[in-house]
Amino acid sequence: MNGYASWVYYEEIFGRASRYRAFWWSPDSQRLGFYRFDNSAVPMFPIYSPFGQDGTLLQTRYPKAGEPNPSVRIGIIEARAGAQPVWADFDDSPEQYFGTPFWGADSRELYVSREPRRQSVLDLYAVSVADGSKWLEMRH
């Protein structure tokens, strides 16, 4: 799904204040950076919602420890009719997490943090809006 966060990103990475939003306008308003989530490998899990007179049992894709996470692709698209996305040069392995990205002041790069699932290192990459190529800016 484009620009709508999976449960694990909503709950654990972006936070509830994101309201599942997984897209970000460039400072010059010419492009939109977004995350595309593939939840198909994430197991379903029942979650009870107490709202309403009788409540509701909802089925949601919820990755428990050791189970698959969603795979994520990072796209950048121009804000014009017919534009095609440029995909950031990351693999779509579910064994990694991406943090909330931010734009460079000149709107030429989208900065993205990435860490492996075991969260042993944090890398900050700059991604070119022109071709999706990336380069490492910082490792922590």
Tell me the role of every PLM-derived stretch.
Residues N2-G3, A41-P43, P94-Q96, Q119-V121:
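A short local loop/turn or secondary-structure capping micro-motif enriched for an aromatic residue
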Residues M1-W24, R31-W87:
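Predominantly five- to eight-bladed beta-propeller fold
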Residues R73, T100, D123-Y125:
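Conserved beta-strand and immediately adjacent loop positions that scaffold enzyme active sites
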Residues A79-R80, Q84-P116, V129-D131:
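Long hydrophobic segments that form regular secondary structure
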Residues R16, D54-L57, F98, L110, ...:
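Short, surface-exposed linear patches
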Residues M1-N2, V86-D89, K134-H140:
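Beta-propeller fold detector
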Residues S18, N69, S93-F98, Q119:
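Loop/turn position at the start of each blade in beta-propeller repeats
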Residues R21-W24, G33-N39, K64-P68, F102-A105, ...:
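Beta-strand C-termini and the immediately following turn/loop, strongest in propeller blades
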